[in-house]
Amino acid sequence: MAKKVVKVVKLQIPAGKANPAPPVGPALGQAGVNIMGFCKEFNARTADQAGLIIPVEISVYEDRSFTFITKTPPAAVLLKKAAGIESGSGEPNRNKVATVKRDKVREIAETKMPDLNAADVEAAMRMVEGTARSMGIVIED
């Protein structure tokens, strides 16, 4: 019989930088998970993606064991990296902070495809372009 899931914890942690300090420690401590075990495993799995924020979904079972799934980084994080900016615009409709080429948007959309609810790459690109627009980033051909 399959183990029963007691709790699902969703976090966004910088790749390779999980440690028992907040927010990781308290979230997993409440679920009774071995925090250091998770941190070591997460850091090993995400070591090659340094500098990105990785969403992770941790399933905690009755016997306090756990499994976790890492997702692709948020589109906003990938767009900021592509544009080379620290943060998006405070007033995206007035202040544009950067420009990104359409082929870079396609690259981000292809990276995000497994996690997006899109039928094809074009639909995924439109989602990423919408995120860019709301951050004050201009898309150019």
UniProtKB/Swiss-Prot annotation:
InterPro entries from the UniProt entry: Ribosomal_uL11 (IPR000911), Ribosomal_uL11_bac-typ (IPR006519), Ribosomal_uL11_C (IPR020783), Ribosomal_uL11_C_sf (IPR036769), Ribosomal_uL11_CS (IPR020785), Ribosomal_uL11_N (IPR020784), Ribosomal_uL11_N_sf (IPR036796)
GO cellular component: cytosolic large ribosomal subunit
Pfam family, one: Ribosomal_L11_N
Source taxon at top rank: Bacteria
Biological process per Gene Ontology, one example term: translation
Entry's Gene Ontology molecular function annotations: large ribosomal subunit rRNA binding; structural constituent of ribosome
Gene disruption: observed consequences: Depletion gives a strong growth defect, a ssrA deletion and rplK depletion is synthetically lethal. RqcH is no longer recruited to 50S ribosomes, no change in RqcP recruitment.
Keyword Isomerase: no
Gene3D superfamilies, per database record: Ribosomal protein L11, C-terminal domain (1.10.10.250), Ribosomal protein L11/L12, N-terminal domain (3.30.1550.10)
Post-translational modification: One or more lysine residues are methylated.
UniProt keyword terms in alphabetical order: Antibiotic resistance, Methylation, Ribonucleoprotein, Ribosomal protein, RNA-binding, rRNA-binding
Family annotation (HAMAP family): Ribosomal_uL11
Other remarks on this protein: An unidentified mutation in this gene gives rise to thiostrepton resistance.
UniProt subunit comment: Part of the ribosomal stalk of the 50S ribosomal subunit. Interacts with L10 and the large rRNA to form the base of the stalk. L10 forms an elongated spine to which 2 L12 dimers bind in a sequential fashion forming a pentameric L10(L12)2(L12)2 complex. In stalled/isolated 50S subunits interacts with RqcH.
Function: Forms part of the ribosomal stalk which helps the ribosome interact with GTP-bound translation factors. Required to recruit RqcH, which is part of the ribosome quality control system (RQC), to stalled 50S ribosomal subunits.
Family, similarity comment: Belongs to the universal ribosomal protein uL11 family.
Protein name: Large ribosomal subunit protein uL11
